[in-house]
Amino acid sequence: MSDESRPSPAETPATTFAETSAETSAAGRSPARTAAVIPAAGRGVRLGPGAPKALRALGGTPMLIHAVRAMAASRAVSLVVVVAPPDGAGEVKSLLDAHALPERTDFVVVPGGETRQESVRLGLDALPPEYGIVLVHDAARPLVPVDTVDAVIDAVREGAPAVVPAVPLADTVKQVEPAAAPGEPEPVVATPERARLRAVQTPQGFDRATLVRAHGTVTDDVTDDASMVEQLGLAVVVVPGHEEAFKVTRPLDLVLAEAVLARRRLNDGF
């Protein structure tokens, strides 16, 4: 693999698509293609000392490679852009070169920024014009099933400007007044209705023009890209997520991810 994209077959469109900017960039043109952007510049301090979070090993393979393969597993995704740490693009390129990746998918590595939002913007800037649907995926969600990826893409194709996979909450959630110092008691101010709450996952899918507009307009710090689209006053829709698309943030998450991966390899030959 080189820095230049490898040739890949054109994405095959479904029978009918909604006529949105995500699917038809202009009258008479073929449907827009789908790319995935993976910001992988974070350090992941909650996992403890060691390599950056995206480069931590899972089943002997860096989590980033698992995340890249998860995006490429969808036949709709023909390009994956990995946004590396500002000083680590060369290392990430070498990492991708050293692992088997699908030949039908192109892979590009670009240096990231100081913040996640800046890194996603740099990933968007690297996309060729024919890509009108964009997935943004956390490198720390290495085990997302391909059915979830495809469900997000399908919802964007059907006309949604922004789509997030999500799962119902198992725990009751309390809204609190934050304590003045860590460890102090925090007063509860509300208990949201759990049936109306969802835990959001990735990949999140977008009409490209909508996501570019959001990143060019919203300057507040946000925890995900869909929140930026919400601030534009546009609709964000939820599709079913998956319990295995959890985020590896703490050491216990890594233990769970190892168990899930071991079960897949035993049962599915993954």
UniProtKB/Swiss-Prot annotation:
Pathway(s) this gene product operates in, as recorded in its UniProt entry: Isoprenoid biosynthesis; isopentenyl diphosphate biosynthesis via DXP pathway; isopentenyl diphosphate from 1-deoxy-D-xylulose 5-phosphate: step 2/6
Documented EC number(s): 2.7.7.60
A Pfam family of this chain: IspD
InterPro entries: IspD (IPR001228), IspD/TarI (IPR034683), IspD/TarI_cytidylyltransf_bact (IPR050088), ISPD_synthase_CS (IPR018294), Nucleotide-diphossugar_trans (IPR029044)
Origin: domain of life: Bacteria
Region (Disordered) residue spans: 1-33
Residues at the site labelled Positions MEP for the nucleophilic attack: R194, K247
Disulfide bond entries: none
This protein's UniProt keywords: Isoprene biosynthesis, Nucleotidyltransferase, Transferase
Reactions catalysed according to its record: 2-C-methyl-D-erythritol 4-phosphate + CTP + H(+) = 4-CDP-2-C-methyl-D-erythritol + diphosphate
Compositional bias segments (type: Low complexity): 7-27
MF term (GO), any: 2-C-methyl-D-erythritol 4-phosphate cytidylyltransferase activity
GO biological process: one example: isopentenyl diphosphate biosynthetic process, methylerythritol 4-phosphate pathway
Site (Transition state stabilizer): residue numbering on this chain: R46, K53
Family: Belongs to the IspD/TarI cytidylyltransferase family. IspD subfamily.
Primary role: Catalyzes the formation of 4-diphosphocytidyl-2-C-methyl-D-erythritol from CTP and 2-C-methyl-D-erythritol 4-phosphate (MEP).
Name of the protein in question: 2-C-methyl-D-erythritol 4-phosphate cytidylyltransferase
Organism: Streptomyces coelicolor (strain ATCC BAA-471 / A3(2) / M145)
Organism lineage: Bacteria, Bacillati, Actinomycetota, Actinomycetes, Kitasatosporales
Gene name of the encoded protein: ispD
